[in-house]
């Protein structure tokens, strides 16, 4: 009976949303090109199918978090899926193409967080294993699970931002069986099988043992959560959620660890250009795609500015 009620609520919500938003589908691809970078405005699957096989040296990105956020009203937007199963079906198409375009022996790094279900939407409160779903999807399509990295985040900041019941001190006092720990971020690294024909080498003068010991830690404790690109210019009047750019510390560590200077770095979900700025700053090349126009415009500006600033010094 409760399940039937949930389905009715879900259908009602979908009907309401369809009245409020006119769904669109962008089928063309427009391209911006700069010094060392290309940015494509269009659906990531359409874009990646135009990329040459085994041409990408490293890929790093943060995908839409299943059905958690609504980013645009485009039918191709993976954030518009109704549930985890539908999202993973669409995401799997992209993973197939990622396997094709990646060079052998090279790495794809995926940023994610496990999602908390809610009573209003799911009828229960528990963590959904989003990171596990991503691992299964990549492994099912031929990738090897290279390593997981946990990114520490402050539970106090999470509590203040979300007012999550499980993090409140009053919950601890009233019934600590309802208390939980804070949510970490994850960077999941996957490797395409085969021999890497261009080893990623490190100069010990630039990368001393201290650097390696910090990066080799299974938990990155020193990521500055506030070090992100300025997102204000990418907002549009129809945004339902706040934009949350990936931390530059995470991007830069991954780019330095798993690619060489001059390598081609790819992000299918460029957003406002964080991965591209990180790649260009570290003397890599970048190719990306972004479906939402306001994000694309901001990313194009950020990429151009990043390269311009480098040429000044």
Where are these regions (language model features)?
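C-terminal alpha-helix
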Residues: 8, 302-306
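A conserved SF2-helicase RecA2
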Residues: 1-24
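Core catalytic lobe of class I
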Residues: 26-298, 304
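Acidic, low-complexity intrinsically disordered tails
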Residues: 23-26, 311-313
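Asp-based, Mg2+/Mn2+-dependent phosphohydrolase catalytic module
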Residues: 288, 308-313
